[in-house]
Design a protein with these regions (language model features):
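Histidine/acidic-rich helix-loop-helix segments that form or flank divalent-metal centers
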Residues: 111-113, 182-245
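Terminal helices and disordered tails flanking the catalytic cores of nucleotide-processing hydrolases
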Residues: 205, 240-332
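Active-site lining segments that contact anionic ligands and/or coordinate catalytic metals
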Residues: 134, 138, 192, 212, ...
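Short, mixed-charge aromatic SLiMs
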Residues: 54-66, 164-168, 196-202, 253-259, ...
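Histidine-centered, transition-metal-coordinating active-site segments
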Residues: 80, 93, 148, 166, ...
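Glycine- and charge-enriched loop/helix tracts that form the active or gating conduit
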Residues: 1-142, 146-164, 168-186, 275, ...
Length: 332
């Protein structure tokens, strides 16, 4: 009756009944249509897209939990860009994730342009999906550049820049997760952290890599260092094969350096060789700011490679720093 088999063979998604009534009765069907298109690599019939455009505001009556469930399913599809391009075309994305819409477009001043960060983001997302099924890492890929519109600047000599977009973007993640009623637990922390660190390996790969810089990267990323590197490799979207090979080789060097430093210095999930209690007992003091200062100096010395990550050298430095702060060994 509705010729559904024919539509399936043609890879077309359309409603069996009047689409206006279908989408009006249950606005979540608009997102489901997009999700099915993304999961199956189907097309939504143009007339249905136009109806979704006209009914898009009704998505606001749907609970945020049901909306983010559909977003998660789109993110977990083989090629999520299909879904997000449809969300943009239908106007749903502007309502659900306006931060992404602001990434679209190319500015030009004096012949100098920047890339379209919306389509770049979708390329990164599709790239990362080839290497991981981790939903939250896919969220990182989707949101890693959302700070760029707020940090976009033009300089006559250097052209366009987005300095600090990682920091700004990481701050925006919380608002997005809260608005969409996504988990505000360790999953949020994971996404925020990787958005914040998203450019660090890129900077390292384009300069001479020092052990100190690698130690700090491992210290900041912890157990998520491998996911961070996967993100950075997915961020290579150049169409120049030689450049792509060069960037991938650079990241390979960074990965090898990470493995090297990690095996030698044991920085991942760093714990101070001596505790605050040990410092208090040694100097016979109560909790105070001096303890934090001593621990910070020890941490910095280890990350800089000035001392090894062990108790003996940490204790020696503790005594020197303590003496400089006017502390003396407590004699019972």
């Amino acid at each position: 009756m509705f010729d559904g088999v024919h539509d399936l063979k043609k890879g077309i998604i359309k409603t069996p009944k009047d689409p206006k009534i279908t989408f009006y009765d249950d606005p979540l069907r608009m997102m489901r249509a997009v999700r099915f298109a993304s999961q199956l690599n189907f097309e939504i019939k143009n007339s249905n897209i136009e109806i979704i455009k006209s009914e898009k505001e009704r998505i606001n009556i749907i609970s945020k939990e049901r909306i983010h469930e559909e977003l998660n399913k789109i993110l977990l599809s083989p090629k999520p860009s299909i879904g997000f391009i449809l969300l943009m075309k239908t106007g749903l994305l502007e309502i659900i994730l306006p931060e992404l819409i602001k990434l679209e477009g190319i500015d030009e001043i004096e012949g100098k342009t920047h890339k379209d960060n919306f389509y770049h983001t979708l390329q990164v997302l599709d790239n990362i999906c080839k290497n991981t099924n981790n939903l939250w890492l896919r969220w990182v890929a989707l949101l890693h550049d959302i700070g760029k519109p707020k940090t976009k600047r033009y300089n006559k000599k250097k052209g366009w820049s987005f300095h600090g977009h990682e920091y700004v973007g990481s701050k925006m993640v919380f608002k997005i997760f809260k608005r969409l009623k996504l988990p505000l637990n360790y999953k949020l922390d994971y996404v925020k952290k990787l958005v914040l660190l998203s450019s660090r390996p890129v900077i390292l790969s384009s300069s001479e890599i020092t052990d100190s810089a690698i130690r700090r990267l491992i210290f900041d990323a912890g157990d998520d260092i491998d996911d961070l590197m996967t993100l950075c490799e997915a961020d290579i979207t150049t169409k120049n094969a030689k450049l792509e090979k060069k960037y991938l080789n650079n990241f390979k060097v960074v990965r090898e350096k990470i493995k090297d430093v990690e095996e030698r210095d044991k920085i991942r999930n760093f714990q101070p060789p001596i505790s605050g209690k040990y410092i208090m007992d040694y100097f016979g003091i109560k909790p105070c700011k001096e303890i934090g200062l001593i621990k910070e100096r020890i941490k910095e010395a280890i990350l800089n490679g000035d001392i090894n990550n062990d108790v003996i050298q940490a204790k020696e430095l503790m005594m020197i720093v303590g003496e400089g702060l006017g502390l003396k060994k407590y004699e019972k």
